[in-house]
Amino acid sequence: IFMANYKMIIQYDGTRYKGWQRQKTTDQTIQGKIEAILSRQYGRTIEIDGSGRTDAGVHAHGQVANFRLPDACCAGKTPEELCEELRQIFVQYLPEDIAVTEVRVASERFHSRLNVVKKTYVYRIWNADYPNVFERKYMLHDNRPMDVEAMRQAARYLLGKHDFAAFCGNAKMKKSTVRTIHEIDIRRIGEEIRFTYTGNGFLQNMIRILTGTLVDVGCGVYPPERV
């Protein structure tokens, strides 16, 4: 059976979901929602592979995923026609907090996770005495004074290839905890402090733990070199 390979770009608001990865105990996952729609539409189990497994409550602007459709699902349609059909299916059936922004035919060998070059995560803090009403779902409110330059100094110690086991939320992690961080950008934008991390991959809860550590430095809990 010939299986055409399709690549899609997904954006989602992760507020009410238990993360990306499908779970047996809940249907509130991003992967589970998309797979359910595809499987129902084509009358067979269709599994998708994501480039990364975002944690519960994490949002995505450009999650990459791929899946395969057997010829039997195509009903004589061209790849371009099938891509358009898939776009319409997602628009019609996905909830309003998940959107597939792009669908196209990928090469036979393309795999969204195995072909990752780098990933970028952003963590946002609203650093003011008052909360941000309209962005409250997307920013942590912390009103403590923070030294951005001290956090930047600490971030330099985290760059490069390291064993980040101490920054992993899963103590039972059996796979390698070695990762490479290419860049950490920390900047103040008005009342917001924005942390942008780029690397070859990140562990479970790693972004949250990294940010918490840098914030401790920014608040003077310990000096940058302690990182």
Residue ranges and their predicted role:
Residues 2-227:
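Structured-RNA-binding interfaces characteristic of tRNA pseudouridine synthases
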